[in-house]
């Protein structure tokens, strides 16, 4: 039996990878692994800083910690398998493993909602500062975050079983480096056009609702900032919002290409590059954008490093005295 026959009768899929036949797989492995380490470290540090420093116990940083958790999930669900495939000739992924990837990656819908809520948080902080403690109290924040996670999870619970229920009789080779729904559906030997249309409508809706919140929020913020007499107030307002605008631009740019543009604009190579952008690069960029442009986060990091340095000095001094 040839390779094609084996693939058709296997319960596994085969991932072709980010680059089908990389000229320098070792170099690609080193680059992706470095990005992975930086992304994981940056997001975990962000989560720990927000948890440990009482000055960061505010709605904005609580939402930011949830963003870091989601980004950690995205990169952990795709990159380890990608790195394994770069080192191994066996590029198979089990049916269950593929379904797990699809489910967790549909949580990206939750990140859309979370970015919309972060824009609303900035709107309240800039336009209604006196009512901020009331409008963004702990109960409201928890409700908003739970809603984001539930929204993304419901998307996964609906799309994953339907996608994996189609018969895959053409091939088991997925032209991608992870199980993305459009790439998996190309293997089906039945008509998936109705499902793809419904999925397209669902994705557009999940994009437009948060994007509308973001657009309205920042329109009000710009109008409020324009009416400010204080140059310091304007600078602070722009500094507060600029990091979020950068993250939204990067994330929604990739999402717009993937979910909104018609099929004629898509090629497997372009799709893989864009997917790498939002599953690998964005989780690395998000915490860096927020931390490098945020004095509170930088101060919290210095405080933690100072504690570590003091503890180490005390240990060394104790050892010297005992010696």
From Swiss-Prot:
Transmembrane intervals: 27-50, 59-80, 102-120, 140-158, 196-219, 237-259, 273-292
Keyword annotations: Cell membrane, Disulfide bond, G-protein coupled receptor, Glycoprotein, Membrane, Olfaction, Receptor, Sensory transduction, Transducer, Transmembrane, Transmembrane helix
Gene designation: OR2T35
SUPFAM superfamilies for the chain: Family A G protein-coupled receptor-like (SSF81321)
GO annotation, cellular component aspect: plasma membrane
CDD domains reported for this sequence: 7tmA_OR2T-like
Native source species: Homo sapiens (Human)
Pfam families: 7tm_4
Its biological purpose: Odorant receptor.
Location of this chain's protein in the cell: Cell membrane
Protein name as it appears in the record: Olfactory receptor 2T35
Domain of life: Eukaryota
GO-annotated biological processes: detection of chemical stimulus involved in sensory perception of smell
Single GO molecular function: G protein-coupled receptor activity
Chief location: membrane
Disulfide cross-links: 98-189
Extracellular topology ranges: 1-26, 81-101, 159-195, 260-272
Cytoplasmic side: 51-58, 121-139, 220-236, 293-323
Family membership: Belongs to the G-protein coupled receptor 1 family.
Membrane topology: Multi-pass membrane protein
Glycan-linked positions: 9
InterPro entries given in the database record: GPCR_Rhodpsn (IPR000276), GPCR_Rhodpsn_7TM (IPR017452), Olfact_rcpt (IPR000725)
